Every structure is written in C-alpha cells, then in structure tokens.
Amino acid sequence: MALTKKQRAELRMKFGGRCAYCGCELPEKGWHADHVQPVARIHEQDMKAAEKGIFKLKATGGVRNIYADTLENQYPACAPCNLFKTSYSLEMFRKQISLQVERGRKSSVNFRTAERFGLVEIVAKPVVFWFEKYQAEGANQLPS
C-alpha cells in the first residue's frame, strides 16, 4: 500500500521520530515503512536476464499476505534495520540479532582481534526493541 505524505509523516513520529527497532533518529527522508507482519512480496524470474544466463528475480508488485498490507501493520524503521529484518517475524528478527555476536566472533578476524585487546566487550542481555521501551516507559520518559 502506498502511503500519503501525511500518513508517512505520522508513521515516522509513531515512536518519537525514531526507528521502531534500534531507536536511532529517523531523517526526514531515507527511512522505511516496515511491515511488522511481513507481506511476502511475490517475485518471478526475470526472463531477459535468463536469456543472458543470469538468474534474477523481480518483484511483480503482488503480495502473498494482503491482510498484512495495512497502515496499522507498519512501523517506521531505519534502512539498515528494515533490510536486515527482511521478512522475519518480530521474534525471528530478535533471534537473528541475538546471533550477531557469535557470528562476528566466528567469521571476523577483526572482531576477534578487537575482543582480544579489550576493545569489544560482549554483554549477554535480551534484545529489546525501541518500540517496546517506548510503549513501556511512555513517550515522555525517553530521550528525544
């Protein structure tokens, strides 16, 4: 669903002008309207690319979960959070974020070096999204 300028402005301010997930401040432009419950966009193979031996999918414009394509199901998100979330549910997104430390430790010599020299300290704590803090503490309690 395409949002009007007014709807987009209201959505941006839903959690104090911050990303619903990480809490970073959202710029006027460049942020995403995320579907909390994924809409699962329909893709098909790009036949022009296939003629060149390239496998490429393109969006058809359709969605599998049309019921989820509503304004009430949208949260404001920074581009990095929305692109990482893709079509995960909130709990699967939370799980994927919680796995990042171990993934970094396993696959990045830079991470392991920084950790070895005390530049990175691992803290075991649950992933709590900004919107959860915002709703629990109230808009007036959190920094703007």
Model regions: which residues?
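Extended charged
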Residues: M1-E10, K14, C24-P27, M47-Y75, ...
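The −1 position to Zn-ligating cysteines in a subset of zinc-ribbon hairpins
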Residues: R18, H32, A77
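Histidine-centered catalytic micro-motifs used for acid/base chemistry in nuclease
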Residues: H32-P38
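Compact nucleic-acid interaction/catalytic patches
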Residues: I42-Q45
